[in-house]
Design a protein with these regions (language model features):
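Flexible, charged surface loops at secondary-structure boundaries
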Residues: 1, 72-75, 120, 244-247, ...
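Conserved class I S-adenosyl-L-methionine
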Residues: 3-10
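Structural motif
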Residues: 5, 78, 290-291
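Conserved Rossmann-like nucleotide-binding pocket used by diverse enzymes
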Residues: 7, 33, 63
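Signature of N6-adenine DNA methyltransferases within the class I
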Residues: 10-20, 29, 36-42, 54, ...
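Conserved hydrophobic residues forming the short capping helix/wall of the S-adenosyl-L-methionine
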Residues: 24, 49, 53
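Conserved SAM-binding loop
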Residues: 45-46
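Polybasic, glycine- and aromatic-enriched phosphate-binding surface used to engage nucleic acids
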Residues: 217-372
Length: 372
């Protein structure tokens, strides 16, 4: 096309504009519709654009509005940007409006609403979003929506997306208007420094609870040893330092207390609690076969929850969910092996921060098939 229309839904000070200008300098006309809710951004952005002294064929429209509620009557060739990553919690009325227009109303996170609206308005859509999109339960529906489009590429920046910001990000590129989907997808990774083309039905397989960008033969071989989807996961949200003390009736275990089939005593670390009456985690007290796994770690290890103890939010508690056999110490020992660690890194998409053990990721703590 000689004339193209580009929408940037949350333009800020226009970081992507110089790159887009360079990419499409061969076009006869490029119209940018630049949207931002913050008018101050436009003051800075207009100054920057003046200094760039761009040819007349680049036209800019400034739309000071909320992208999610603004009515657009144009279909865009390209939608590109970096939507806000934040949960809307303080304005229920606005949140209800956003959710009313969205298929995924199980999240309060703005970037998910941005993805859906961008797909409805553009032919090609590319957004930089948090990596939790790939695996978090709250984005299960968003991933389904993305799979319905023709996904062309996912780029995993790890923590390298934004200087000085400790957040893991990815970007995706998709085409919305195609009848036949491509069978493969390109995965570019700044973590492994690789660019690979793989089959979509392999990486985005319904066999697993979320997308596995780094799935490989070794992962598949290890998968064959285990039966998955065994446990539910629970994490406490109530226990804080305000309610624990140095000694008391029940010991409160934290992540560093959990070893490989052992519970460690740690000086100046252990804490206790007397009253568990109003704590949700109390339902696990003195139950058999509750498995503890530290929450945010690359080095999984597990042990059974001992008598007269509970855990804080740094430990996930796993309980059987579907009439499987009981876990044994040998199963738990396997979670601490180098082999399982390699498997788990792939299962967690080489994440460093989005490592919560939730009801999606707990799927991968399987039980060994060779134990009956």
């Amino acid at each position: 096309k000689k004339k193209i229309r580009i929408l940037e839904p949350s333009v800020g000070i226009g970081n992507f504009i110089p790159l887009l200008v360079e990419k499409y300098e061969d076009k006869d006309e490029v119209i940018f519709d630049l949207v931002d809710i913050d008018n101050n951004s436009f003051v800075v952005l207009k100054n920057i654009l003046d200094k760039l002294k761009l040819p007349k064929k680049f036209k800019f429209n400034f739309i000071n509005a909320d992208f999610l509620t603004h009515n657009f009557n144009v279909k865009y060739d390209i939608i590109v940007g970096n939507p806000p990553y934040k949960k809307l919690t303080n304005n229920q009325e606005l949140l209800s409006l956003y959710k009313f227009n969205a298929r995924n109303n199980e999240t309060n996170n703005l970037f998910s609403f941005f993805i859906e609206k961008a797909i409805s308005l553009g032919n090609f859509v590319s957004l930089i979003v948090p990596k939790s999109l790939i695996n978090s339960p709250e984005f299960n529906i968003t991933r389904e929506i993305l799979k319905e489009q023709n996904l062309l590429k996912i780029c995993d920046y790890g923590e390298k997306g934004f200087k000085g910001v400790k957040i893991e990000t990815i970007s995706f590129l998709l085409e919305t208007s195609i009848k036949k989907q491509s069978e493969s997808i390109v995965i570019e990774s700044y973590i492994t420094e690789t660019v690979e083309e793989k089959r979509k039905d392999y990486l985005l397989s319904d066999k697993f609870p979320y997308w596995l960008l780094y799935r490989n033969e070794e992962f598949d071989e290890i998968s064959e040893k285990m039966k998955f989807d065994i446990f539910n996961s629970f994490r406490d949200r109530q226990i804080t330092k305000q309610i624990t003390k140095e000694n008391g009736k029940y010991r409160v275990l934290k992540s560093r207390n959990v070893g490989n089939n052992e519970v460690k005593e740690l000086e100046n670390y252990d804490c206790y609690i007397d009253d568990t009456e109003n704590l949700a985690v109390a339902k696990f007290l003195n139950r058999d076969d509750v498995v503890m796994i530290p929450n945010l770690t690359y080095y999984p290890r597990a042990s059974f929850l001992p008598k007269n103890t509970i855990t804080d939010g740094s430990v996930a508690l796993l309980t059987l969910k579907n009439g499987s056999r009981l876990p044994t110490e040998r199963d738990l020992e396997y979670y601490g092996t180098k082999e399982f660690e390699r498997f788990y890194r792939v299962a967690r998409n080489y994440g460093t921060r989005s490592l919560n053990i939730d009801n999606n990721s707990v799927f991968f703590f399987g039980l060994l098939k060779d134990i009956d």
